Amino acid sequence: MVRIRLTRMGKKKQPFYRIVVVDQKKKRDGAYVESLGYYNPLKEPYEVKVDIDRAVEWMLKGAQPSETVSKLLGKLGLYEKLEEAKSKKA
């Protein structure tokens, strides 16, 4: 199964994360299929940048977001765009 999840970047005690599409069986920081954006929890307020159109496309293909990524994408309005895309497709 393909998942949309975080992969850790940055140095010790200064993490930031890439939001990536990856096979579920790969390691956390292993090879990924595509990078969709990034999440920086150290900025105030935290910084998230995601290519929403590509994320919707991957979710329509069956990619499942992790719990954390699901919350981040929900705050960016991904699920509204996903519903629009599903209604256009039907």
Swiss-Prot record:
GO terms for biological process: translation. It comes from Fervidobacterium nodosum (strain ATCC 35602 / DSM 5306 / Rt17-B1). GO terms for cellular component: cytoplasm; small ribosomal subunit. Belongs to the bacterial ribosomal protein bS16 family. It comes from the Bacteria. Coiled coil: none annotated. The keyword Ribonucleoprotein applies. InterPro entries: Ribosomal_bS16, Ribosomal_bS16_CS, Ribosomal_bS16_dom_sf. This is Small ribosomal subunit protein bS16. Keywords: Ribonucleoprotein, Ribosomal protein. The keyword Flavoprotein does not apply. The gene is rpsP. Signal peptide: none annotated. GO terms for molecular function: structural constituent of ribosome.
